[in-house]
Swiss-Prot record:
One of its GO terms (biological process) is translation. InterPro entries: Ribosomal_uS15 (IPR000589), Ribosomal_uS15_bac-type (IPR005290), uS15_NS1_RNA-bd_sf (IPR009068). The lineage of its organism: Eukaryota, Viridiplantae, Streptophyta, Embryophyta, Tracheophyta. It holds the Pfam family Ribosomal_S15. This is Small ribosomal subunit protein uS15c. Part of the 30S ribosomal subunit. CDD domains: Ribosomal_S15p_S13e. It is found in: Plastid, Chloroplast. One of its GO terms (molecular function) is structural constituent of ribosome. It comes from the Eukaryota.
Amino acid sequence: MVKNLFISVISQEETKENRGSVEFQIFNFTNKIQRLTSHLKLHKKDYLSQKGLRKILGKRQRLLAYLSKKNKVRYKELIEKLDIRETKTH
């Protein structure tokens, strides 16, 4: 697994200040999701990792929904930077 392929949208100075921000949490979950998907491509029967991936996907989806309700502009910018598909809303 190559760690250099992961997204580095947030600079080091910003990560020290904003570790609790919604954007940083979504960014962190996105990196974890990318690592787990690359792991699951090699280990297809690793069901515990699949369960962990589904949990992280749910957490990220809830945070994205929260961010879209609170601030649409920041939500759109983050989705573009992280190359995430927009969630379907009812």
